[in-house]
Swiss-Prot record:
Binding site for ATP: R217, D218, E219, Q226, E474, G526, F527, D528, R529
Site (Important for tRNA non-discrimination): H30, G80
Keywords tagged on the record: Aminoacyl-tRNA synthetase, ATP-binding, Cytoplasm, Ligase, Nucleotide-binding, Protein biosynthesis
Encoding gene (name): aspS
Keyword Transmembrane helix assigned: no
Source organism per UniProt: Helicobacter pylori (strain G27)
The enzyme's E.C. designation: 6.1.1.23
PROSITE patterns the UniProt entry points to: AA_TRNA_LIGASE_II
Protein name: Aspartate--tRNA(Asp/Asn) ligase
Enzyme class: ligase
Ranges where the record places region Aspartate: 195-198
Record GO cellular component, one term: cytoplasm
Function, in words: Aspartyl-tRNA synthetase with relaxed tRNA specificity since it is able to aspartylate not only its cognate tRNA(Asp) but also tRNA(Asn). Reaction proceeds in two steps: L-aspartate is first activated by ATP to form Asp-AMP and then transferred to the acceptor end of tRNA(Asp/Asn).
One MF term in the entry's GO annotations: ATP binding
Amino acid sequence: MRSHFCTEISEKDVGKTIKVAGWCNTYRDHGGVVFIDLRDKSGLVQLVCDPSSKAYEKALEVRSEFVLVAKGKARLRGPGLENPKLKTGKIEIVLEELVIENKSATPPIEIGNKSVNEDLRLKYRYLDLRSPNSYEIFKLRSEVALITRNTLAQKGFLEIETPILSKTTPEGARDYLVPSRVHEGEFFALPQSPQLFKQLLMVGGMDRYFQIARCFRDEDLRADRQPEFTQIDAEMSFCDENDVMGVVEDLLQAIFKAIGHTISKPFKRMPYKEAMENYGSDKPDLRFKLPLIEVGDCFMDSSNAIFSNIAKDPKNKRIKALNVKGADALFSRSVLKELEEFVRQFGAKGLAYLQIKEDGIKGPLVKFLSEKGLKNILEKTGAKTGDIVFFGAGDKKIVLDYMGRLRLKVAETLDLIDKDALNFLWVVNFPMFEKTENGYHAAHHPFTMPKNIECEDIEEIEAHAYDVVLNGVELGGGSIRIHKEEMQKKVFEKINIHEEEAQKKFGFLLEALKFGAPPHGGFAIGFDRLIMLMTKSHSIRDVIAFPKTQKASCLLTNAPSPINEEQLRELHIRLRK
């Protein structure tokens, strides 16, 4: 039906008969001469038709998004008529034949216009997908999936599918539940991850497993979250952290080569505590410096009791400083006010600062600091004339969070981030447990191997866990798993999952661990998030063919939707009104 894709045509084809097919992107009638921009997956080419052509009458019928097959000779555009914005901007096709394969209603959205309301784009997603940019995204997505399969297969991994209909074993988010028609009153759960099945595959001697897995989580959505998503999932037997990290680094190196980036190995490694203390995040963006500096000791003799008391409680409190070079000339009073309002959203009670000026140090904190304290702050932060040093003080968790966010906000405001840089990082030595209102829960998941389970302070127990971070975004992570029943029971006890509950929820796993489970570990990389970063897309919804909204609904199909009474009866379900 066609001889070329639109953008395959070049100056070397001038004089040749060309046949192309696609959609009418734009239509123009200039004094009797008709111009049609034809669009296919590759891009645009201009068709031109004058009244002498036998295709002219048909060309007059064409409107936006009509499906066309066109035949004609390629020629150079006239002087001054080239379009440098198009790959085919120097040539056009003089129409000899034109077939309208299908007509189109007036499109409710402009194809390729990202400023169109997103809800409207999602409602007509099949039109939104017609843009060449969308095609390039899904072409790359397909290529990355193929690279993943080839790379892992070469390393001896087997691609094995794990069940979609499974048992509910909550991993932090809510499960999506599927009622069983055969087993009245019982439910399957859609998997939040293949975690337990891939561990069972290791018990079964599969040694190295992977799949590009579909996962489901019923949780509140954010810009980078979807209720159903895809991850590159893998597990290895007889391995340690270094083995797993090596596989991930090799895989990411191969993947990013596809978009022309050479990334070096091994990736930098940073302990969790260092990431939190120096950057206020467990996924720090290292494309710029701006570290957080601990200055609690500079406030020990502060005349302000609030600051001095915080300084004397280093276990639970923090006083962090952020020195922004040259900010005194760049940040007006209104900008400083905006930054204060910004951190208040995340629990800050205000934003104290010192301005380092030619005639001395200014700012609301000066009166509370001794001369020695001020001197120490300048030494610790490296502050010079023209700088502004911001301070956060209070509860450790809150201060680290809002100062980390302030760090990012300042970097964005001052354009300190190299948008073309790729900064990979491993964050390691995560805490095994996190405190909640009802005790403790597993920071990653309860199947992670702890490093020092006998430590009396539960908050000091670390996990054999690791996250891979790119430019401040968590790409994925993994851990070495527990492979002995006794250790698994100990971890369950720490998070108040006692024997009866453990057997009810995870009895099949505990049983499997009795039969010679090998040491094993693995990882998962968020596939959608990876493609979002590689394509520099604004939202994860741009890289999923038919995504859900932030309210977990599909505007295209109107899912979820009610079901009829007969279906409910078959499933033994009665709805309360």
